[in-house]
């Protein structure tokens, strides 16, 4: 089986969020199942820098390939590299006008960029003369890939046997634009209707991916159910219910070779489940680095997030002073809404030896926080999958979560009677339940040392690898091919 993955960001070439981790890791494990995977992504400005840093070669494949379907004279060049330690080829769609911004999701026109990339990825496949059984597109930026394949390329013999899979990583980001972009995209006018791309008078790229792909997946079983409800459906719940028979939730995993406390070079001291006492050394070193009091008797709570409403930061705003009464330390890493950045800067000033606010994106510091923290806080309003809780489990850092989406699928409440469970959580989205859950975790840390040791070991034993998920994706690909045949 041959699979083409199309995504806007892929680790280690360009990373902004969890999408890059997923599309960087999934091909590796699918490849081990005997599937040949090829990845297509834009040649963002950061790609060259990252390849140079990693010693990865970039080869020129072709220049000035035209896009006859689009209303543009812009052409694209094609370059190639390889995902490290694999045989997975990565092809870069290069165009100086669309992909020369410093940041991945910036540029002259996000709608045009996504249209250009989606069509260019398809034309790149044709140029390479590589036929694919599956084209697997990710998120709204590639939502038009299934649309193109089911319309303008429907009778193209090159894609005659190609089935499509579309993955929703976060329904909150849909790519909604002025309908005038239909003309630029070269798409037929009849697609602008309620059963097509039309969405409250606009066009919706994500809706296109949902309606025109053979199979739709999202990133956890619970989230797949949630998004079919009005509460979580972001006005697409009706469309998703229409595709319910073809909608699957597959929990993401993490790359165990990349995230391994026993070998991770970015943390202070390596450790494993048999030498878990060394985890404390990471804690004291991080406390020193961040100018916190060096104390093992107080729990260190870490939080690494985009600083946006989705992540439950409005709850933290209201209870942080009460949290400090528990005698804890709190480390925050992330960027986002200015109001939250200012909030975290201000509480650091208020509690200088207890709180460290780091308003930046720093991969190395993130790894240190995962390894050094006793607990990891994720009180999300909604969370399609979440990777932070998986990294924390891998490093023996006990997650405190709101049970929603992938958090509900990966974190199980610790039960002192059965000594089963790997974390602590709450369901109702309010300050009282969050504060109660933090208090519970702090109590176990300070007063129930035996139970705390058990929940830490349970966390480290939790399987959050890609292996199980990769097998599920193989079944999905086979199902997509079966549907394509009808």
UniProtKB/Swiss-Prot annotation:
Keywords: Glycogen biosynthesis, Glycosyltransferase, Transferase
SUPFAM superfamilies (alphabetical): UDP-Glycosyltransferase/glycogen phosphorylase
Pathway(s) served: Glycan biosynthesis; glycogen biosynthesis
Keyword Nucleus tagged: no
Gene3D superfamilies per the UniProt record, alphabetical: Glycogen Phosphorylase B
One GO term (biological process): glycogen biosynthetic process
Annotated residues for binding of ADP-alpha-D-glucose: 15
Enzyme class at the top of the EC tree: transferase
Record-linked InterPro entries: Glyco_trans_1 (IPR001296), GS/SS (IPR011835), Starch_synth_cat_dom (IPR013534)
EC identifiers of the protein: 2.4.1.21
A molecular function (GO) term: alpha-1,4-glucan glucosyltransferase (UDP-glucose donor) activity
Reaction(s) the record says it catalyses: [(1->4)-alpha-D-glucosyl](n) + ADP-alpha-D-glucose = [(1->4)-alpha-D-glucosyl](n+1) + ADP + H(+)
Coiled coil (residue ranges): none
UniProt record similarity statement: Belongs to the glycosyltransferase 1 family. Bacterial/plant glycogen synthase subfamily.
Function noted in UniProt: Synthesizes alpha-1,4-glucan chains using ADP-glucose.
NCBIfam families: glgA
Name assigned to this protein: Glycogen synthase
Organism: Pseudothermotoga lettingae (strain ATCC BAA-301 / DSM 14385 / NBRC 107922 / TMO)
């Amino acid at each position: 089986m041959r699979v083409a993955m199309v995504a806007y960001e892929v680790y280690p070439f360009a990373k902004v969020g969890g999408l890059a981790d997923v599309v960087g890791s999934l091909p590796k494990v699918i490849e081990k199942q005997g599937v040949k995977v090829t990845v297509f992504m834009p040649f963002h400005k950061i790609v060259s820098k990252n390849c140079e840093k990693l010693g990865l070669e970039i080869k020129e494949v072709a220049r000035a390939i035209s896009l006859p379907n689009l209303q543009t004279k812009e052409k694209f060049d094609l370059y190639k590299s390889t995902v490290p330690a694999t045989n997975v080829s990565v092809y870069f769609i290069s165009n100086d006008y669309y992909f020369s911004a410093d940041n991945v999701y910036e540029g002259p026109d996000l709608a045009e960029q996504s249209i250009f990339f989606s069509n260019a990825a398809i034309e790149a496949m044709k140029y390479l003369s590589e036929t694919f059984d599956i084209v697997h597109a990710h998120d709204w930026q590639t939502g038009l890939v299934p649309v193109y394949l089911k319309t303008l390329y429907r009778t193209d013999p090159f894609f005659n046997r190609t089935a499509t899979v579309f993955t929703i990583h976060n329904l909150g980001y849909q790519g909604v634009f002025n309908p005038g972009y239909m003309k630029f995209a070269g798409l037929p006018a009849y697609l602008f209707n309620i059963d097509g791309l039309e969405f409250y008078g606009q066009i919706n790229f994500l809706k296109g991916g949902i309606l025109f792909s053979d199979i739709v997946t999202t990133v956890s079983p619970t989230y797949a159910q949630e998004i079919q409800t009005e509460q979580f459906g972001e006005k697409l719940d009706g469309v998703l219910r229409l595709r319910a028979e073809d909608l699957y939730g597959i929990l993401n995993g993490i790359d165990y070779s990349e995230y391994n406390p026993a070998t991770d070079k970015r943390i202070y001291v390596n450790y494993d489940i048999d030498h878990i006492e060394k985890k404390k050394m990471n804690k004291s070193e991080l406390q020193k680095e961040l100018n916190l009091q060096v104390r093992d008797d107080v729990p260190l709570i870490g939080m690494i997030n985009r600083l946006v409403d989705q992540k439950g930061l409005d709850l933290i705003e209201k209870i942080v002073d009460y949290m400090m009464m528990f005698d804890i330390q709190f480390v925050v890493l992330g960027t986002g809404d200015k109001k939250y950045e200012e909030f975290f800067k201000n509480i650091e000033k208020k509690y200088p030896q207890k709180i460290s606010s780091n308003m930046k994106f720093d991969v190395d510091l993130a790894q240190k926080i995962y390894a050094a923290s006793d607990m990891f806080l994720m009180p999300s309003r909604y969370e399609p999958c979440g990777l932070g809780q998986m990294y924390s489990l891998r490093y023996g850092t006990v997650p405190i979560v709101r049970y929603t989406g992938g958090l509900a699928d990966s974190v199980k409440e610790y039960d002192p009677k059965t000594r089963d469970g790997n974390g602590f959580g709450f369901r109702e989205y309010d300050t009282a339940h969050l504060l109660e859950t933090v208090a519970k975790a702090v109590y176990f840390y300070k007063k129930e040392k035996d139970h705390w040791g058990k929940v830490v070991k349970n966390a480290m034993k939790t399987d959050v690898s890609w292996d199980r998920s990769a097998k599920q994706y193989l079944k999905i690909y086979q199902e997509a091919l079966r549907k394509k045949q009808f």
